[in-house]
Curated annotation (Swiss-Prot):
It comes from the Archaea. Protein S19 forms a complex with S13 that binds strongly to the 16S ribosomal RNA. One of its GO terms (cellular component) is cytosolic small ribosomal subunit. The gene is rps19. GO terms for molecular function: rRNA binding; structural constituent of ribosome. This is Small ribosomal subunit protein uS19. InterPro entries: Ribosomal_uS19, Ribosomal_uS19_CS, Ribosomal_uS19_euk/arc, Ribosomal_uS19_SF. Keywords: Ribonucleoprotein, Ribosomal protein, RNA-binding, rRNA-binding. SUPFAM superfamilies: Ribosomal protein S19 (SSF54570).
Length: 152
C-alpha cells in the first residue's frame, strides 16, 4: 500500500519536472524558423496575417534589416545590441526570438526581450503607453465625500 503511494508520488514529480516544448499551432520553434514568411503568415490570426501579406512600410523594412543584422551577430556568437525602434506595429516573427528591442512608448524606450510565446503579437503590445493608475488614500479635496475624512 505504502510502496504504491510512493510510486504515484514519484511519477507525479517526474511529470512536473518534464519541460514542455514550445509549439505554435502545432509547429516547434525550429520548424517555424525554417519556414518562409508567407507560409508562417498562414498560421497567424487574420489581423496579423493581413498586416504581413500587405507588405512592409519603409519604417518596418528598416527594422527588418536591423533584425537580420542582429540575427547574423547572434549566430556568430556575439551578443547584439538592443534594437531601438518606434515601430510598434511590427508583428513578432520566429526569427526575432532571442533578440532584445527598445520599443518607444511615447516617452521612453521600453526594453522587450522576445520569447517564443510572443510570436504572432505586435511589438507595441509589450510596451505600454499609459501607466496603470495607482490610487492614493483619500485626502482633503479629493472628492465631495472626502470632506468627512478626518485630517491627520
Amino acid at each position: 500500500m505504502a510502496s504504491a503511494r510512493r510510486r504515484r508520488i514519484k511519477k507525479k514529480k517526474q511529470v512536473i519536472s518534464k519541460k514542455i516544448e514550445f509549439r505554435y499551432r502545432g509547429y516547434t520553434l525550429e520548424e517555424l524558423q525554417q519556414m518562409p514568411l508567407r507560409e508562417f503568415a498562414k498560421l497567424l490570426p487574420a489581423r496579423q496575417r493581413r498586416t504581413l501579406l500587405r507588405g512592409l512600410t519603409p519604417q518596418q523594412k528598416k527594422l527588418a534589416m536591423k533584425i537580420k543584422k542582429a540575427r547574423r551577430l547572434l549566430n556568430k556568437g556575439k551578443e547584439p545590441r538592443i534594437i531601438r525602434t518606434h515601430c510598434r506595429d511590427f508583428v513578432i516573427t520566429p526569427d526575432m526570438v532571442g533578440l532584445t528591442f527598445g520599443v518607444y512608448n511615447g516617452k521612453e524606450f521600453v526594453e522587450v526581450k522576445v520569447t517564443p510565446e510572443m510570436i504572432g503579437h505586435y511589438l507595441g503590445e509589450f510596451s505600454l503607453t499609459r501607466k496603470p493608475v495607482q490610487h492614493g488614500a483619500p485626502g482633503m479635496g479629493a472628492t465631495r465625500s472626502s470632506m468627512f475624512v478626518p485630517i491627520k
